[in-house]
Amino acid sequence: SLDSETAALTVNSISGSEATEVRLGLSSLETGISYALLSGAGLTESSFFTLGGAAAELYNGTFSVSNGTLYVNLSDKEGLLRWKSGTWNTESSNTSWSLDGTPSAYADGETVYFSNGDGVDKNVTIAGNVAPGRINVSGTDFICTGDGSITGDTTLNLLDGASLTMNNANSYAGDTVLGDGSKLVVGNAGALGTSTVLLQGDSVLELTTGTWNGLGTRLNVNSSGTLKLSGNASGTTTAALTGVRYELGANTTLTLSAGTYGNTITGAGTLISAVGTNVLNGNVDITGEYRVLATNGTACTW
């Protein structure tokens, strides 16, 4: 993790003046601290460094150089509507949000942010329909509950290292994107609406309930994280999701449509091969059951 004393990277010498984008992990960042990033002989200029990636969504970065070490000091980005506490609805008198430190109301179409911070309630109760343009989650352990629903073409982004549990039913249709190291726990079979989910890096999508037929289309084909089934969840997937790792909890079931799989599949659940031919080239370590389905007169091989 970053600190203010020791540079994250030390090199023998540094030269050049090309524009350089600095990307920082979000999990341990705080405002008002000068983080030591890079140290090396010849480092005297900070003007060509800029803040990029997920951190740039939330912070302004001021770079400086002292004694051959590059530092960045972060401040909250202005104009972001950040969750504070209370109930999420569209009432103009409901100031459950903060805009540059001022209690504020939410209106449909806005981009909203769920970040860690003093006085932030991680339990988000949704009342009625809400339709933000985009939801950015950078904090950890947020939980959405209530009788309300996220609707419209909303996109849901879990930035690197963020975590969110969705226990309410939603109908939003925009993409759901999980950044590296983030985790989305689905506690309601209708939580994802009609959204397509993209897993990036070491992100985790955990389905704890429901029957998820068609995972091969609900997940973006470029996904690379882990799909975890827990509770009483079950699902059917296809070989198209070549980069996804599957983790099956006890009492869960994953059915593989016919195809050739190079995926890692582990856990204590049940793995089923549907009618047709399945070839498993990946690491498969299941302590539950293996089942092969067959139809009279139809070939089925494992």
For each predicted feature, which ranges?
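Extracellular beta-strand/loop-rich repeat segments of large surface/secreted proteins
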Residues: S1-A36, G86-T90, T194, S203, ...
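Solvent-exposed adhesion/ligand-recognition segments of exported proteins
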Residues: G25-D153, S163-T165, A169-S171, V185-N188, ...
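Secondary-structure transition/turn motif
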Residues: V72-G79, N170, T209-G210, S230-S234, ...
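Short, T/G/N/S-enriched strand-turn elements that build extracellular solenoid repeat scaffolds
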Residues: A7-G16, W97, G101-S104, V112, ...
